[in-house]
Amino acid sequence: MSKHPANSSATDPVDNLQTLIRCPSVTPAEGGALSALAAMLEPLGFTVERMVAREEGTPDVENLYARLGTEGPHLMFAGHTDVVPVGNEADWTYPPFSAEIAGGELYGRGAVDMKGGIACFVAAIARHIESQGAPKGSISFLITGDEEGPSINGTTKLLEWAAAKGERWDACLVGEPTNPDQLGDMIKIGRRGSLSGEIIVKGVQGHAAYPHLADNPVRGMIKLAEALMHPAFDAGTENFQPSNLEVTTIDVGNAATNVIPARASAKFNIRFNDTWTAETLRTEIIARLDTASADPLLRPGRPPIAYELVWADRPSQVFLTRNNALISSLSAAIEKMTGKTPALSTTGGTSDARFIKDYCPVVEFGLVGQTMHMVDERVAVSDLEALTGIYGAFISSWFTHAGA
């Protein structure tokens, strides 16, 4: 094992997290967070590179890639330093970027989502280097500043940039908060897919007292929305809950109570399991809308509902990770440090793991997520130490299994 001089401050997850929280990196601003992270990693022997991603019509975003080692096996840790806005700062018990500790908890925006996970993984690898030397292989940090934003200039472009330079990975751990109640509850081994769209129905505007002279698009829109939500798309699968579609908005752009609107629109999102792909779901949704729009009882004496369907860009495909070395190493580390056997889950929303899956097997494990995005976001100091221990045990176990 090669030796690198360890930065003693990097071995303390609390110090690491306080440093990161004090950087106001509200998406897409870097806020000093990537510079602070680089200052932790470089003394450990990491080669740190900064990459600025650009796309017309979107803000430039700074990202970071750091690697220790040149040989395989290669473990990636992925995450983000950007955070959501703080809301009304006056509602916070402590200033959101002060990283105050009170009652055994560390307060600050990003404490849970997900500067805490980064702080713990840095501490874990720093302790490993200090006690055992660098792992026999390579370890890297892939950290974006565009996860809480549109995710255009973040992980996708950073992965493409790194892969174009010849980087290849054997496995990835994403440090997102995965635990519902207690540290050790849950590992995410996959994610449902996500597909969104908008339906537009055009009618004829008129006076509410003279409906025969108008054509109310809301009547048709209600039927189309019902057709999307019922019946259920499926009953779920072995590893996934049932697919679920929600109509999230219905708008007519009309504030008057005596005017029949000329246009109605509705947006929807479906979280889908491995019964479907985005392509097969599009076909199913169009079939449901066509059937509902042609119902002769809906518009007697009038033509079928004319609707327009607009799909949102970049649907997320469903995925499931089946990699024994990765999952068993992490599960064993969690059980060793907490005494809990973690559930292997695919619940919840999407994450940047959906991009990483195309490059290597990926799982997610981090802190307890109860206060993420909330006023007074906070983490138990004891959980930071425990997560650092879990990550440390995982690093040792994974390199042992992957190098065997």
Swiss-Prot record:
Residues at which Zn(2+) 1 binds: H80, D113, E176
Cofactor binding mode and count: Binds 2 Zn(2+) or Co(2+) ions per subunit.
EC number of the protein: 3.5.1.18
Domain of life (superkingdom): Bacteria
BP-aspect Gene Ontology terms: diaminopimelate biosynthetic process; L-arginine biosynthetic process; lysine biosynthetic process via diaminopimelate
Positions of Zn(2+) 2 binding: D113, E148, H373
Cofactor needs: Zn(2+); Co(2+)
EC primary class: hydrolase
Pathway linked to the protein: Amino-acid biosynthesis; L-lysine biosynthesis via DAP pathway; LL-2,6-diaminopimelate from (S)-tetrahydrodipicolinate (succinylase route): step 3/3
Gene3D superfamilies: 3.30.70.360, Zn peptidases
SUPFAM superfamilies cross-referenced by the UniProt entry: Bacterial exopeptidase dimerisation domain, Zn-dependent exopeptidases
The UniProt record lists the keyword Hydrolase: yes
Active site per UniProt: D82, E147 (proton acceptor)
Main function: Catalyzes the hydrolysis of N-succinyl-L,L-diaminopimelic acid (SDAP), forming succinate and LL-2,6-diaminopimelate (DAP), an intermediate involved in the bacterial biosynthesis of lysine and meso-diaminopimelic acid, an essential component of bacterial cell walls.
Name of the protein this chain belongs to: Succinyl-diaminopimelate desuccinylase
Native organism: Allorhizobium ampelinum (strain ATCC BAA-846 / DSM 112012 / S4) (Agrobacterium vitis (strain S4))
Gene name tied to this protein: dapE
